[in-house]
Amino acid sequence: ELGVIVPPVHIRDDLRLAPGGYRVLLSGVVVALGQVHAHRLLALDPTGTATRGLPGEVTTEPTFGLPAKWITPTERSRAEAAGCTVVDATAVIATHLAELIRRHAHELLGRREAQELLEVAGKTDGKVIEELIPHLMSTGDVIKVLRSLLREGVSIRDLRTILEALADHAGAIKNPD
């Protein structure tokens, strides 16, 4: 979505966490925690009132902080009829990871990943890259610009347009941060 090459996600069991608990680390730092129940479904209740009559464990959805309730699969149709979106534990974790990748994309773009993107772009737009790097900007400065765009939530998928804009305006850029 943002044009970043996502590094592999390593999954390890951690007996220090509660059953069903998970945490996400980025460069060794915890960036998120969550809790899932393998044989239950999460009924997302944006109004905070739709799940009142449903049996289950009240919780907060980990990605966006919405009111929710862990329910049994037999309660799914009641929850959906009440206006809830119902998802399984796998979807909860996948959504959480996808959002964390979006929020931290600028931290995931290292020099190696950026170089891979530039090499791929070079196969189709080599002239722009030749013109830009190193004559107008260093590779490091281009990476800083790409990270800044990602920090702002701007996709770098259309790298050609970004590189062309940098080549056109490199002389006016004083600080690529």
For the regions a language model picked out, list residue spans one by one.
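Membrane-embedded alpha-helical signal segments
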Residues: 1-177
